[in-house]
A protein has these predicted regions:
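Short, solvent-exposed beta-strand edge segments and adjacent coil->beta transition regions
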Residues: 89-91, 240-244
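Core AdoMet radical
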Residues: 113-129, 133-160, 166-185, 189-227, ...
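N-terminal [4Fe-4S]-dependent radical SAM core
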Residues: 24-110, 114-119
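Short Lys/Arg-enriched alpha/beta "domain-start" segment
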Residues: 1-40
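Active-site glycine- and acidic-residue-rich loops that bind
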Residues: 174-181, 247-257
Length: 258
């Protein structure tokens, strides 16, 4: 509450805050969700430092990252930095479009909180903003993602962004995107510098998926399977290929069968 009152705290993804430990580890911890009140962990301010406690017992002094004030800067062609990027934890997310294709057609995922951005998507502005963060801000890796795009546009933008990043830095690039119907596209992703990739199935039960995710739920599980198998061929099976799932959205039997 102390940092929030000062307007300094930097929000993490999905109603969370990044806790910074003295050994350099950063933990992304939800705190604006209903389940947060059940946590045995709490953070106190003793007038000087922020203290992490477990069942009211001292664990460690921690710190937070401050607000990314660069979000309000404007690129040469009028794009606000915060509409293209999101700096949190150890990464810089770069959006590959401003608006989720499914949300634009009233088929967005009902659990998603990604909001559409104003203006036109301009790759030259995106590259300018990437340059700024590379030259002025410390972070470990890139994430290309945020919302779903129309297949060809999404794929072309991902390749353009990845290629630009790779020409200017060796930082790892993680892409979170839809599974391409043409899996050969994944070879182009890798050639353009992507190191990790994720196709998020979220819900196995396709009937429930189509209700909860009207657009994305229409993608057959076989398309995910084909993309994931091809990705493992390209990036290996040691953690560079993944898929996120939402536990509790379908019967546990369907979840385990998936």
């Amino acid at each position: 509450q102390n940092m929030k009152n000062k307007g300094m705290i930097r929000q993490g993804v999905f109603q969370s805050v990044d806790l910074k430990f003295n050994n350099g580890i950063v933990i992304n911890a939800p705190y604006l969700t209903d389940f947060s009140v059940m946590s045995p962990f709490e953070i106190d301010f003793n007038g000087k430092n922020y203290i992490l406690k477990y069942y009211n017992r001292y664990l460690e002094t921690i710190s937070f990252d401050t607000l990314d004030t660069n979000r309000n800067k404007i690129a040469s062609n009028g794009t606000m930095y915060g509409n293209v990027t999101f700096l949190a934890t150890d990464r810089l997310r770069v959006h590959h479009q401003f608006r989720c294709y499914f949300k634009m057609h009233d088929q967005g995922c009902k659990f998603c909180n990604v909001k559409p951005k104003e203006g036109n998507y301009d790759l030259s502005d995106v590259f300018e903003i990437i340059d700024f963060y590379l030259n002025n801000v410390d972070f470990r890796h890139f994430l290309i993602g945020g919302g779903s795009g129309k297949a060809e546009i999404e794929q072309n933008n991902i390749m353009a962004i990845a290629s630009y990043i790779r020409k200017h830095t060796k930082k790892p690039i993680y892409a979170m995107c839809l599974p391409p119907e043409n899996i050969e596209v994944l070879e182009e992703y890798k050639k353009n510098g992507i190191n990790e990739i994720s196709f998020n199935i979220e819900i196995f039960n396709r009937k429930i998926a189509r209700t909860t995710m009207p657009g994305k739920g229409k993608i057959p599980l076989k398309q995910y399977e084909n993309a994931l198998k091809k990705a493992v061929e390209l990036w290996g099976s040691s953690g560079n290929v993944r898929s996120m799932l939402v536990l509790g959205m379908e019967p546990i039997e369907d979840f385990l069968d998936g």
